[in-house]
Amino acid sequence: ITGRKVIRTEQSSGTGNGAPGITDGEKASKPDLKKVSSKMQMIQSIIDQVFLYDEDATEVEEYIYRGMMAGLNDPYSVYYTAEDYKAIQESTDGSYSGIGAMISQNKTTGLCTVVKVFEGSPALEAGMKPGDIIYKVGDTLVAGESLDVLVSNYIKGKEGTDVQITVYRAESDTYEDMTITRRKIEVPTVESKMLADNTGYVAVSEFDAVTVEQFEKAIDELENQGMKQMIIDLRSNPGGMLDSAVAMVDYILPDDRKDFEKGEGKTLIVYTADKNGKGDTYTAADGHEVDVPIAILVNENSASASEVFTGALKDYKKAVVVGTTSYGKGIVQNLIPLGDGSAIKITTAHYYTPSGFDLHGKGITPDVEVELDENLKSQSVVTPEEDNQVQAAMEALKEN
Protein backbone atom coordinates (compact mmCIF):
# COMPACT_ATOMS: atom_id res chain seq x y z
CA ILE A 1 0.00 0.00 0.00
CA THR A 2 1.27 3.46 -0.60
CA GLY A 3 0.75 6.77 1.00
CA ARG A 4 1.84 9.99 -0.69
CA LYS A 5 4.62 12.46 -0.57
CA VAL A 6 3.65 11.67 -3.62
CA ILE A 7 2.57 8.21 -2.22
CA ARG A 8 1.11 5.11 -3.91
CA THR A 9 0.88 1.16 -3.78
CA GLU A 10 0.32 -1.09 -6.21
CA GLN A 11 -1.07 -2.77 -7.79
CA SER A 12 -1.02 -3.51 -7.47
CA SER A 13 0.06 -3.73 -7.39
CA GLY A 14 2.41 -5.75 -7.41
CA THR A 15 2.92 -8.02 -4.42
CA GLY A 16 5.82 -9.82 -2.77
CA ASN A 17 6.72 -11.75 0.34
CA GLY A 18 8.19 -9.81 3.15
CA ALA A 19 9.54 -6.64 4.62
CA PRO A 20 13.06 -5.25 4.87
CA GLY A 21 15.45 -7.77 6.41
CA ILE A 22 16.26 -6.11 9.73
CA THR A 23 15.29 -8.10 12.81
CA ASP A 24 13.98 -6.44 15.96
CA GLY A 25 16.75 -5.05 18.13
CA GLU A 26 19.38 -4.92 15.37
CA LYS A 27 20.94 -1.71 14.11
CA ALA A 28 21.34 -1.47 10.35
CA SER A 29 24.81 -0.24 9.36
CA LYS A 30 24.79 2.46 6.72
CA PRO A 31 26.97 2.09 3.64
CA ASP A 32 30.21 4.07 3.75
CA LEU A 33 29.42 6.42 0.87
CA LYS A 34 32.92 7.91 0.87
CA LYS A 35 34.40 4.43 0.45
CA VAL A 36 31.77 3.54 -2.16
CA SER A 37 32.51 6.72 -4.12
CA SER A 38 36.24 5.99 -4.08
CA LYS A 39 35.69 2.44 -5.31
CA MET A 40 33.33 3.61 -8.04
CA GLN A 41 35.95 6.08 -9.25
CA MET A 42 38.47 3.23 -9.34
CA ILE A 43 36.10 1.04 -11.37
CA GLN A 44 35.31 3.94 -13.72
CA SER A 45 39.03 4.48 -14.26
CA ILE A 46 39.42 0.84 -15.28
CA ILE A 47 36.42 1.13 -17.62
CA ASP A 48 37.93 4.23 -19.22
CA GLN A 49 41.24 2.47 -19.81
CA VAL A 50 40.29 -1.01 -20.98
CA PHE A 51 36.54 -1.42 -21.70
CA LEU A 52 36.19 -2.55 -25.31
CA TYR A 53 32.81 -0.99 -26.08
CA ASP A 54 31.21 2.43 -25.77
CA GLU A 55 29.85 3.17 -22.32
CA ASP A 56 26.26 4.41 -21.89
CA ALA A 57 26.74 6.76 -18.94
CA THR A 58 23.02 7.22 -18.30
CA GLU A 59 22.41 3.49 -18.14
CA VAL A 60 25.36 2.95 -15.79
CA GLU A 61 24.08 5.64 -13.44
CA GLU A 62 20.58 4.17 -13.42
CA TYR A 63 21.92 0.73 -12.54
CA ILE A 64 23.85 2.24 -9.64
CA TYR A 65 20.64 3.70 -8.23
CA ARG A 66 18.69 0.50 -8.90
CA GLY A 67 21.40 -1.51 -7.18
CA MET A 68 21.29 0.64 -4.07
CA MET A 69 17.56 -0.01 -3.67
CA ALA A 70 17.91 -3.69 -4.58
CA GLY A 71 20.51 -4.01 -1.82
CA LEU A 72 17.78 -3.36 0.75
CA ASN A 73 16.48 -6.89 0.03
CA ASP A 74 12.91 -5.59 -0.01
CA PRO A 75 10.91 -6.39 -3.15
CA TYR A 76 8.77 -3.27 -2.65
CA SER A 77 11.64 -0.75 -2.44
CA VAL A 78 12.73 0.26 -5.94
CA TYR A 79 14.22 3.08 -8.00
CA TYR A 80 12.23 4.61 -10.87
CA THR A 81 13.73 6.49 -13.78
CA ALA A 82 11.97 9.69 -14.83
CA GLU A 83 10.23 7.71 -17.58
CA ASP A 84 9.09 5.01 -15.13
CA TYR A 85 7.83 7.59 -12.65
CA LYS A 86 5.85 9.47 -15.29
CA ALA A 87 4.15 6.22 -16.36
CA ILE A 88 3.20 5.44 -12.75
CA GLN A 89 1.72 8.90 -12.25
CA GLU A 90 -0.34 8.49 -15.42
CA SER A 91 -1.69 5.12 -14.27
CA THR A 92 -3.08 6.58 -11.03
CA ASP A 93 -5.28 8.92 -13.08
CA GLY A 94 -7.22 5.97 -14.50
CA SER A 95 -5.90 6.13 -18.07
CA TYR A 96 -2.80 4.84 -19.85
CA SER A 97 -1.61 3.36 -23.15
CA GLY A 98 -1.33 -0.37 -22.75
CA ILE A 99 -3.06 -3.70 -23.34
CA GLY A 100 -5.96 -3.62 -20.86
CA ALA A 101 -5.07 -6.48 -18.53
CA MET A 102 -4.51 -6.68 -14.78
CA ILE A 103 -1.42 -8.63 -13.71
CA SER A 104 -0.41 -9.98 -10.29
CA GLN A 105 3.00 -11.21 -9.11
CA ASN A 106 3.30 -14.36 -6.98
CA LYS A 107 5.11 -13.53 -3.73
CA THR A 108 6.99 -16.85 -3.67
CA THR A 109 7.84 -17.61 -7.29
CA GLY A 110 7.92 -14.09 -8.70
CA LEU A 111 5.81 -15.24 -11.66
CA CYS A 112 3.54 -12.58 -13.18
CA THR A 113 0.06 -13.87 -13.95
CA VAL A 114 -2.89 -12.26 -15.72
CA VAL A 115 -5.77 -12.05 -13.24
CA LYS A 116 -8.22 -9.98 -15.29
CA VAL A 117 -8.66 -8.98 -18.93
CA PHE A 118 -10.87 -5.93 -19.42
CA GLU A 119 -13.82 -6.07 -21.78
CA GLY A 120 -13.15 -4.40 -25.14
CA SER A 121 -9.40 -4.32 -24.50
CA PRO A 122 -6.66 -5.14 -27.03
CA ALA A 123 -5.51 -7.95 -24.70
CA LEU A 124 -8.93 -9.61 -24.93
CA GLU A 125 -8.99 -9.18 -28.70
CA ALA A 126 -5.57 -10.87 -28.93
CA GLY A 127 -6.79 -13.88 -26.94
CA MET A 128 -5.20 -13.23 -23.55
CA LYS A 129 -6.98 -14.99 -20.66
CA PRO A 130 -6.94 -14.92 -16.86
CA GLY A 131 -4.38 -17.45 -15.65
CA ASP A 132 -1.91 -16.74 -18.46
CA ILE A 133 1.65 -16.45 -17.11
CA ILE A 134 3.72 -13.70 -18.74
CA TYR A 135 6.83 -15.49 -20.04
CA LYS A 136 8.39 -13.10 -22.52
CA VAL A 137 7.80 -9.57 -23.81
CA GLY A 138 9.47 -9.04 -27.17
CA ASP A 139 12.79 -10.86 -26.93
CA THR A 140 13.09 -10.26 -23.19
CA LEU A 141 12.48 -13.01 -20.65
CA VAL A 142 10.72 -11.31 -17.75
CA ALA A 143 11.56 -13.79 -15.00
CA GLY A 144 12.92 -11.92 -12.00
CA GLU A 145 11.57 -8.52 -13.03
CA SER A 146 9.44 -6.66 -10.51
CA LEU A 147 5.82 -6.16 -11.50
CA ASP A 148 6.27 -2.37 -11.60
CA VAL A 149 9.17 -2.67 -14.05
CA LEU A 150 7.42 -5.30 -16.18
CA VAL A 151 4.36 -3.10 -16.63
CA SER A 152 6.08 0.29 -16.93
CA ASN A 153 9.09 -0.68 -19.07
CA TYR A 154 7.77 -3.50 -21.22
CA ILE A 155 3.98 -3.67 -21.47
CA LYS A 156 2.93 -0.02 -21.46
CA GLY A 157 4.11 2.15 -24.33
CA LYS A 158 3.21 4.61 -27.04
CA GLU A 159 -0.36 4.40 -28.30
CA GLY A 160 -0.62 2.51 -31.59
CA THR A 161 2.61 0.54 -31.17
CA ASP A 162 2.69 -3.26 -31.03
CA VAL A 163 4.01 -5.37 -28.17
CA GLN A 164 4.84 -9.05 -28.62
CA ILE A 165 3.92 -11.11 -25.56
CA THR A 166 4.46 -14.82 -24.97
CA VAL A 167 2.36 -16.43 -22.26
CA TYR A 168 2.47 -19.88 -20.70
CA ARG A 169 -0.80 -21.76 -20.14
CA ALA A 170 -0.43 -24.38 -17.43
CA GLU A 171 -3.68 -26.21 -18.18
CA SER A 172 -2.51 -27.08 -21.70
CA ASP A 173 1.25 -26.88 -21.02
CA THR A 174 1.68 -24.62 -24.05
CA TYR A 175 3.23 -21.28 -24.93
CA GLU A 176 1.13 -18.79 -26.88
CA ASP A 177 2.54 -15.85 -28.85
CA MET A 178 0.35 -12.80 -29.32
CA THR A 179 0.81 -9.40 -30.91
CA ILE A 180 -1.12 -6.70 -29.07
CA THR A 181 -1.53 -3.13 -30.28
CA ARG A 182 -1.36 -0.68 -27.40
CA ARG A 183 -4.31 1.64 -27.03
CA LYS A 184 -5.33 4.38 -24.68
CA ILE A 185 -7.02 2.43 -21.90
CA GLU A 186 -9.72 4.21 -19.94
CA VAL A 187 -10.38 1.81 -17.11
CA PRO A 188 -13.24 2.55 -14.75
CA THR A 189 -11.92 1.30 -11.43
CA VAL A 190 -15.50 0.85 -10.18
CA GLU A 191 -18.29 -1.06 -11.92
CA SER A 192 -21.77 -1.48 -10.45
CA LYS A 193 -25.14 -3.06 -11.15
CA MET A 194 -28.27 -4.15 -9.33
CA LEU A 195 -28.66 -7.89 -8.82
CA ALA A 196 -31.61 -9.94 -7.63
CA ASP A 197 -33.33 -9.12 -4.33
CA ASN A 198 -32.27 -5.46 -4.61
CA THR A 199 -28.65 -6.44 -4.05
CA GLY A 200 -26.24 -3.74 -5.14
CA TYR A 201 -23.03 -5.09 -6.68
CA VAL A 202 -19.93 -2.88 -6.72
CA ALA A 203 -16.65 -4.20 -8.16
CA VAL A 204 -13.48 -2.21 -7.39
CA SER A 205 -10.47 -3.19 -9.52
CA GLU A 206 -7.92 -0.98 -7.73
CA PHE A 207 -7.66 2.08 -5.48
CA ASP A 208 -6.58 5.00 -7.68
CA ALA A 209 -7.06 8.76 -7.50
CA VAL A 210 -10.32 8.47 -9.46
CA THR A 211 -11.74 5.56 -7.46
CA VAL A 212 -13.31 7.41 -4.52
CA GLU A 213 -15.59 9.54 -6.68
CA GLN A 214 -16.57 6.53 -8.81
CA PHE A 215 -17.30 4.44 -5.69
CA GLU A 216 -19.46 7.07 -4.02
CA LYS A 217 -21.38 7.69 -7.25
CA ALA A 218 -22.03 3.96 -7.68
CA ILE A 219 -23.39 3.61 -4.15
CA ASP A 220 -25.57 6.71 -4.47
CA GLU A 221 -27.08 5.41 -7.72
CA LEU A 222 -27.77 1.98 -6.22
CA GLU A 223 -29.38 3.55 -3.15
CA ASN A 224 -31.63 5.61 -5.44
CA GLN A 225 -32.64 2.35 -7.14
CA GLY A 226 -33.76 0.88 -3.80
CA MET A 227 -30.69 -1.12 -2.76
CA LYS A 228 -31.37 -3.24 0.34
CA GLN A 229 -28.01 -5.01 0.60
CA MET A 230 -24.63 -4.75 -1.10
CA ILE A 231 -21.76 -6.89 -2.36
CA ILE A 232 -18.37 -5.17 -2.73
CA ASP A 233 -16.09 -7.23 -4.98
CA LEU A 234 -12.38 -6.78 -4.25
CA ARG A 235 -11.19 -10.03 -5.82
CA SER A 236 -7.79 -9.64 -7.50
CA ASN A 237 -7.66 -5.99 -6.45
CA PRO A 238 -3.92 -5.44 -5.84
CA GLY A 239 -4.37 -2.29 -3.75
CA GLY A 240 -3.32 1.23 -4.60
CA MET A 241 -3.59 4.49 -2.72
CA LEU A 242 -4.12 4.38 1.03
CA ASP A 243 -5.99 7.69 1.04
CA SER A 244 -8.53 6.30 -1.42
CA ALA A 245 -9.17 3.18 0.65
CA VAL A 246 -9.59 5.28 3.80
CA ALA A 247 -12.04 7.67 2.11
CA MET A 248 -14.13 4.76 0.84
CA VAL A 249 -14.34 3.14 4.27
CA ASP A 250 -15.23 6.57 5.66
CA TYR A 251 -18.15 6.78 3.20
CA ILE A 252 -19.58 3.54 4.60
CA LEU A 253 -18.98 3.82 8.35
CA PRO A 254 -20.46 6.41 10.73
CA ASP A 255 -18.06 8.84 12.39
CA ASP A 256 -18.81 8.00 16.03
CA ARG A 257 -17.97 4.32 16.51
CA LYS A 258 -15.92 4.13 19.72
CA ASP A 259 -15.08 0.41 19.56
CA PHE A 260 -11.32 0.92 19.62
CA GLU A 261 -9.42 3.11 22.08
CA LYS A 262 -6.84 4.27 19.54
CA GLY A 263 -9.62 6.08 17.67
CA GLU A 264 -9.99 8.49 20.62
CA GLY A 265 -13.76 8.70 20.34
CA LYS A 266 -13.85 8.59 16.54
CA THR A 267 -14.29 5.73 14.09
CA LEU A 268 -10.79 4.31 13.62
CA ILE A 269 -10.14 3.06 10.07
CA VAL A 270 -6.44 2.12 10.03
CA TYR A 271 -3.19 3.15 11.69
CA THR A 272 0.47 2.80 10.78
CA ALA A 273 3.71 2.42 12.72
CA ASP A 274 7.26 2.91 11.44
CA LYS A 275 10.46 1.34 12.81
CA ASN A 276 10.45 3.87 15.67
CA GLY A 277 6.83 3.18 16.59
CA LYS A 278 5.62 6.46 15.11
CA GLY A 279 2.88 6.64 12.53
CA ASP A 280 -0.44 8.01 11.39
CA THR A 281 -3.98 7.33 12.56
CA TYR A 282 -6.88 7.55 10.10
CA THR A 283 -10.42 8.11 11.36
CA ALA A 284 -13.83 8.67 9.77
CA ALA A 285 -14.91 12.28 9.31
CA ASP A 286 -17.24 12.72 6.32
CA GLY A 287 -20.55 12.31 8.15
CA HIS A 288 -21.87 9.75 5.66
CA GLU A 289 -22.98 6.17 6.38
CA VAL A 290 -24.19 3.29 4.22
CA ASP A 291 -26.81 1.54 6.32
CA VAL A 292 -27.40 -1.76 4.51
CA PRO A 293 -25.96 -5.27 5.07
CA ILE A 294 -22.66 -5.70 3.20
CA ALA A 295 -20.65 -8.66 1.93
CA ILE A 296 -17.07 -8.26 0.70
CA LEU A 297 -15.57 -10.68 -1.82
CA VAL A 298 -11.80 -11.30 -1.58
CA ASN A 299 -9.30 -13.83 -2.90
CA GLU A 300 -5.58 -14.60 -2.70
CA ASN A 301 -4.81 -11.63 -4.99
CA SER A 302 -6.70 -9.06 -2.91
CA ALA A 303 -3.87 -7.10 -1.35
CA SER A 304 -2.74 -4.00 0.48
CA ALA A 305 -5.39 -1.24 0.25
CA SER A 306 -7.99 -3.97 -0.40
CA GLU A 307 -7.06 -5.46 2.95
CA VAL A 308 -7.22 -2.08 4.70
CA PHE A 309 -10.76 -1.68 3.38
CA THR A 310 -11.81 -5.23 4.23
CA GLY A 311 -10.10 -5.29 7.62
CA ALA A 312 -11.83 -2.13 8.81
CA LEU A 313 -15.34 -3.26 7.85
CA LYS A 314 -14.69 -6.75 9.26
CA ASP A 315 -13.44 -5.37 12.60
CA TYR A 316 -16.60 -3.30 13.01
CA LYS A 317 -18.74 -6.30 11.96
CA LYS A 318 -20.10 -4.03 9.23
CA ALA A 319 -19.47 -6.65 6.53
CA VAL A 320 -19.30 -10.41 6.13
CA VAL A 321 -16.18 -11.46 4.20
CA VAL A 322 -16.60 -14.17 1.55
CA GLY A 323 -14.07 -15.97 -0.66
CA THR A 324 -10.52 -17.11 0.08
CA THR A 325 -7.81 -15.72 2.38
CA SER A 326 -6.43 -12.42 1.08
CA TYR A 327 -2.84 -11.82 0.04
CA GLY A 328 -1.35 -10.52 3.29
CA LYS A 329 0.49 -7.31 2.39
CA GLY A 330 0.43 -5.13 5.47
CA ILE A 331 3.24 -2.68 4.81
CA VAL A 332 3.26 0.87 3.48
CA GLN A 333 5.45 2.29 0.71
CA ASN A 334 6.13 5.96 0.12
CA LEU A 335 6.74 7.16 -3.42
CA ILE A 336 9.28 9.97 -3.11
CA PRO A 337 10.35 12.17 -6.06
CA LEU A 338 14.08 12.93 -6.21
CA GLY A 339 13.92 16.31 -7.94
CA ASP A 340 15.22 15.31 -11.37
CA GLY A 341 12.09 13.50 -12.51
CA SER A 342 13.13 10.18 -11.01
CA ALA A 343 11.78 8.72 -7.76
CA ILE A 344 12.12 5.92 -5.25
CA LYS A 345 9.45 3.76 -3.70
CA ILE A 346 10.46 2.65 -0.22
CA THR A 347 8.83 0.64 2.56
CA THR A 348 8.26 2.87 5.59
CA ALA A 349 5.75 1.28 7.96
CA HIS A 350 3.39 -1.52 8.92
CA TYR A 351 -0.32 -0.84 8.96
CA TYR A 352 -2.85 -2.27 11.40
CA THR A 353 -6.60 -2.80 11.24
CA PRO A 354 -8.70 -1.03 13.91
CA SER A 355 -8.45 -4.04 16.25
CA GLY A 356 -4.64 -3.95 16.02
CA PHE A 357 -4.31 -6.93 13.67
CA ASP A 358 -1.07 -7.00 11.67
CA LEU A 359 -2.08 -8.95 8.58
CA HIS A 360 1.32 -8.88 6.88
CA GLY A 361 2.17 -12.40 5.75
CA LYS A 362 -1.17 -13.66 7.09
CA GLY A 363 -3.98 -12.06 5.12
CA ILE A 364 -7.62 -11.74 6.12
CA THR A 365 -9.48 -15.01 6.63
CA PRO A 366 -13.01 -14.89 5.19
CA ASP A 367 -16.05 -15.51 7.37
CA VAL A 368 -17.41 -17.72 4.59
CA GLU A 369 -14.67 -19.61 2.76
CA VAL A 370 -15.47 -20.63 -0.81
CA GLU A 371 -13.18 -21.22 -3.81
CA LEU A 372 -14.12 -20.01 -7.26
CA ASP A 373 -15.28 -22.94 -9.38
CA GLU A 374 -12.35 -24.32 -11.38
CA ASN A 375 -14.12 -23.95 -14.73
CA LEU A 376 -14.56 -20.19 -14.11
CA LYS A 377 -10.93 -19.32 -13.35
CA SER A 378 -9.78 -18.88 -16.95
CA GLN A 379 -12.89 -17.08 -18.18
CA SER A 380 -12.55 -13.36 -18.91
CA VAL A 381 -16.24 -12.62 -18.36
CA VAL A 382 -18.36 -14.38 -15.72
CA THR A 383 -21.90 -13.24 -14.97
CA PRO A 384 -23.00 -12.88 -11.32
CA GLU A 385 -25.50 -15.67 -11.92
CA GLU A 386 -22.67 -18.04 -12.97
CA ASP A 387 -20.24 -16.85 -10.29
CA ASN A 388 -20.42 -19.25 -7.34
CA GLN A 389 -18.60 -16.80 -5.03
CA VAL A 390 -21.11 -14.04 -5.78
CA GLN A 391 -23.91 -16.50 -5.10
CA ALA A 392 -22.23 -17.48 -1.82
CA ALA A 393 -22.13 -13.79 -0.86
CA MET A 394 -25.86 -13.51 -1.63
CA GLU A 395 -26.54 -16.47 0.68
CA ALA A 396 -24.32 -14.99 3.40
CA LEU A 397 -26.31 -11.75 3.28
CA LYS A 398 -29.55 -13.69 3.74
CA GLU A 399 -28.11 -15.39 6.83
CA ASN A 400 -26.83 -12.14 8.32
What are the residue ranges of the model-derived segments?
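Flexible, low-complexity junctional segments that flank or bridge functional domains
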Residues: I1-Q229
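Cleft-lining beta-strand/loop regions that shape enzyme active-site pockets
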Residues: V115, L124, G138, V149-K329, ...
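Generic structural signal for well-ordered beta-strand positions
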Residues: E176, L359-H360
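A short, sequence-level motif marking secondary-structure junctions
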Residues: I180-E186, H350-Y351, P366-D367
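Short acidic, Pro/Gly- and aromatic-enriched capping/linker segments at domain boundaries
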Residues: L338-D340, I344-H350
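Conserved helicase C-terminal RecA-like lobe
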Residues: D367-N400
